[in-house]
Design a protein with these regions (language model features):
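Charged, heptad-repeat coiled-coil alpha-helices that serve as long linker/dimerization "arms"
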Residues: 1-128
Length: 129
């Protein structure tokens, strides 16, 4: 059960990094922008200019994907914490492999998203070295 306690600590330590990632990804701003774009898409005459309509729908799709990736990581974290707490409560070692693999996967997802953020947007013009 010590391993589960260790993973609970690891999960609690990684949670602030998940929140920092939300800030880096501008998730709240993305949600506001997405609401604005959805209102625009639902407005009368939106499809009158197909070029603009395609641009707006593409932008909305990109924002939806970004928000969905972040929310998936949050759900993944919640699920892992639940597994950890259940295993500790029930004294069940059978969930350890799932927890270990899930934690590794979450770390990789977060690192991939962090790197993508660094290599795009406002940081894109910076030198790699």
């Amino acid at each position: 059960m010590i391993e589960f306690d260790e993973y609970k600590v690891k999960l609690n330590n990684i949670h602030p990094k998940l929140k920092e990632l939300a800030s880096s990804l501008n998730i709240e701003e993305c949600r506001v922008d997405l609401d604005r774009l959805h209102a625009q898409i639902e407005s009368d005459g939106f499809w009158d200019n197909t070029d603009t309509a395609q641009k707006v729908t593409r932008q909305a799709s990109q924002l939806e994907a970004k928000i969905e990736r972040y929310e998936k990581m949050c759900t993944h974290w919640d699920d892992l914490m639940t597994i950890c707490e259940m295993a500790i409560e029930e004294n069940d070692d059978s969930m350890l492999d799932e927890l270990v693999e899930g934690y590794k996967s979450l770390e990789e997802e977060m690192e991939r998203e962090r790197l993508e953020t660094l290599l795009s947007g406002e940081y894109d013009g910076n030198n790699a070295i």
